[in-house]
Amino acid sequence: LVIRRQRQMCIRDRPYCSLPELEACMEVWSFMEMIHSRSYTYVIKNVYPDPSEVFDKILSDNRILDRAATVTESYDEFINEAHQYDTGNWWKDGWRDHVSGKLERKEIKRKLYRAVANVNILEGIRFYVSFACSFAFGELKMMEGSAKIISLIARDENQHLAITQNIINNWRKG
């Protein structure tokens, strides 16, 4: 669920990216998330005799949905705020320097910062905690194929962490 939302994030925030390098990076990130989603599907299909039960439960389990919401809520807030700005009048020449227009842009930036910080936490902490069990199976010589897949996903998530940290550090510099 979070993987699918991350792919959507990469696609939805592209209009708000002003650097071609970062836009290309997001494109690659989105592709990686698609591969991760298919990899998780492969692992589940090889562990459960009836994987449809697992897939169906994911979208109805409140604990899973609540956990995903903690990650995606700030991103949705940013997208909604940015969309409101785009469809309003604040960006037009006459309103650009108006106090309300400046406050609106500041709020969009605050929500974007919060969204990227949440993705940073997801990539840097939450994914690694969820990988621990798979790594343990691999060390015990059990489910080694799945552990290898998860280790490749962890490598990608480490790249995503570096990207979000770089973005945050560049914003901090001004």
Q: Where does each model-flagged region fall?
A:
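Long, hydrophobic, well-ordered secondary-structure blocks that form the structural core
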Residues: 12-96
